[in-house]
From Swiss-Prot:
The family this protein is said to belong to: Belongs to the activator 1 small subunits family. RfcL subfamily.
Assigned keywords, A-Z: ATP-binding, DNA replication, Nucleotide-binding
Signal peptide location: none
Quaternary context: Heteromultimer composed of small subunits (RfcS) and large subunits (RfcL).
Region (Disordered): 432-452, 464-518, 568-642
UniProt cross-references to Pfam families, sorted A to Z: AAA, RCF1-5-like_lid
Comp. bias intervals (Polar residues): 476-487, 500-511, 589-603
Species this protein is from: Methanosarcina barkeri (strain Fusaro / DSM 804)
Basic and acidic residues bias (residue ranges): 464-473, 604-635
UniProt GO molecular function: ATP binding; ATP hydrolysis activity; DNA clamp loader activity
Protein name: Replication factor C large subunit
GO BP field: DNA replication
Gene: rfcL
Amino acid sequence: MTLAIEWAEKYRPQTLKEIVGNKKAVQYLRTWAEKWLSGIPDRRAVVLHGPAGVGKTSTAHALARDLDWEVIELNASDQRTAGVIERVAGSAASMNTFFGGKRLIILDEADNIHGTADRGGMRAIAGIIKNTLQPIVLIANDIYGLTPTIRNLCLEIKFGSVQSRSMVPALKKVCESEDILCSPDAIQQIAEGAGGDLRSAINDLQAAATGRKTLEVEDLSTSGRDVKENIFKAMQRIFKSTDCKKALEAARGLDESPEDLVHWIDENLPFQYASKDGNLEDIKTGFGYLSKADLYLGRVKKRQNYRMWRYASMLMVCGTSVSKTRPYPGFIKYQPPSLWKKMGQIRSKRDLRDNIASKVGEHNFESMRYSRNNLLELYSRMLKNEESAIEITAGLGLELEELIYLSGSTKASKKLQKIYERAQELLLEGNEESDGAEFFRTPAPPGNSKEDLSVFSVNNSVEKDGKHSERLEVPNSRTSQGGQKTLNFGFDIPPEISPETKNSENNTSDTIKPGNLAPDILAPVTLTPDSFTSDTLIPEQDQAEIDDIGIKSDSLTSISLEHDSLKVKNSSSLPGPVEKEAFSDSEPIENSISPELSRSVKSVNREPAIKKVSDNSEKSEVKVSETPKKVESKTQKTLFDF
């Protein structure tokens, strides 16, 4: 006999054929799963609900093995907040497997997702079910522990208690595998004492057979297992019985507190004691006992004295049983408390309202509280216009349920469905072309926009006469990252340039041809004697002075201008080429040209600056300052403006 693991886990069914009991429920689950093989069914998730130990989780795992599906499971031992569920189950539900098969997502004990530890879990499950591409199985003991939204999205399959006659063959098989001789009476007693819980029956068998090779009835424990009473059976015993003791036993066997039990009795008492002749005395008497029980429940909360639960339970149970004056035959379908349903609806609407307020606040850079108190009513009024409703739905990314709530409707009308469909089309177009609806496009936060700084550009164009003219272009408008347009401040045309500046630039353009560079940046250009004519370079007032000096333009063979260095190579007769880089408006070039030419150079006003060269150097070399001077507005002369 091996005690390494529990027998209930060791002999867990591996296929659907090995499942004990609930054959119809297993068949329903198999039919639903086969629909996934040909596409996505209408109900993308299923809820297996029923008592503990009847094989719900084992059936889900057996289904995955039969269909060769991968399994991802989240149970009560895992943290199941909204973030965890979306990270684990959400990612698994939205992606296909590597080999193209299906992945079964199992959420065990889904009805126990509540409290601070599992904050937002129910809402995350509902969102995953709506968009899942993989089958999802929810397992719950109490179907009413799930929200109405999840229940409407899922296919409900109920698992009932396993009959004792179905347990006996399974228990005999376990005894044979463990080499234990167990009498039929002992097996029958274990099966009947399990209360329909096969897992508990196997655990009882393991506990009784520990250290034994044979098992008889005398070896079994005299105390039986505490069996939880079903709420519907307990309600039947309370309303049908006239014995107060039996009614109290049924109530004590429930896994319900007196605060919950009083709501069950309050909901079903008018239906159970309804009389055809219109006599309401029994109903009046029953509610009188319930009101007194409610007083004790209030004192329990106020004084924290839980001993008063005893008196409250006796009043609500025994008072209801003895309040009837005659029996009420017939079957009554007992309903869960409507108060819980209303509270669930209110909680669901409150969560829906907060989600909408969060989206509105994010779009308007406001808090959720401010949006909830001040902006939701404004947006609700804006939905009355169909075009505005479409832009709001697309801009905020509203779901159909959120659109229904914000519009104040109770159900999805054809108009709202049309608005939602057009908003989805607008979102698809926005993803392909731009950022969606222009009016409700979320602007970029302050300080994070990356503006295009190249607003102004200099356009160097070559005119017909070969001269370069610089034109400052100002765009009419530009669009920022957030989609907002910026005005051009009235600069539809380039700013006017003063005539003096134009003359200065025209004079410079004949001697210096910078290409596509800005006018204040020198580029290497070679000038030949053909480039200099008296008509273009030498003013008439300076022609006489040049003739007196005796320098002819054809004696200049070449002048080379470079950006980094300046070299002037010449003698009194200028036999060779003259290489020039920059000129100074303050100091003359010595030992390179004649004194007469040096005096003429003093009158030259050029943009770059040069430094004085030593007297003993054979050839003059000067360096250009790294930061060139700005072009002055006054008229400037070139080298040959003598």
